[in-house]
Amino acid sequence: MNPIIRKCVLSVAGLAAAGGAVAGPAAAHAAPVKGKGDRTANYEYQAQPNFFYCGPASARIALSAEGKDVSQDELAVKLGTTQNGTDSAIDITRVLNEYTGGKYRTTEIRDDVATPEQVARLRADIRAAVDDDRPVVANILGGARDVDGVEHSYPGHYLTVVRYEGDVDTVLIADPARPDTPTYWMDVTELANWIAGRGYSS
């Protein structure tokens, strides 16, 4: 099986623990005042409405930075999303490119643990994408800790990277499964290891 093919499936219990992913009003996030080396994509957050729409929701967050107002249902059809989730980061890239004129590409992190070179590549890709007001959509599996020590764990999930600080040592994640805490900061190496075995669209 292609290593970047992973389903987005949250258990009902997992969704409840995540605060219930109910799509409420979209929240616009304009770029705040930035420090040196800080960049934010001008995105609009929207939670996923069910346990299997993390792919469409993350793609929608990314497309909002382009000023695209696309429904999650429309994206789900294009992505082939079912109750088993969205198959692949390749599908995310394909659909993002339909709306952006080909700005996205898929990158794999094939190893179980990201190598220093793969971390450096992710860091460079996040910088280039966010500088271009293009959020990164990551396909993750398992658990990772944010900078506050809070663990986030999924049996397969998509989320969006919308901001970085400094030399891209820490990144801000917009997580469509967490409307109660829609964003959190994570070390870029931790994120790379969360993606490991899968891929991302940047």
Q: What is each stretch, according to the model?
A:
Residues 1-95, 142, 149-150, 165-168:
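Active-site-adjacent structural segments surrounding the nucleophilic cysteine of cysteine proteases
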Residues 74-202:
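Conserved active-site-adjacent core of cysteine acyl-enzyme catalytic domains
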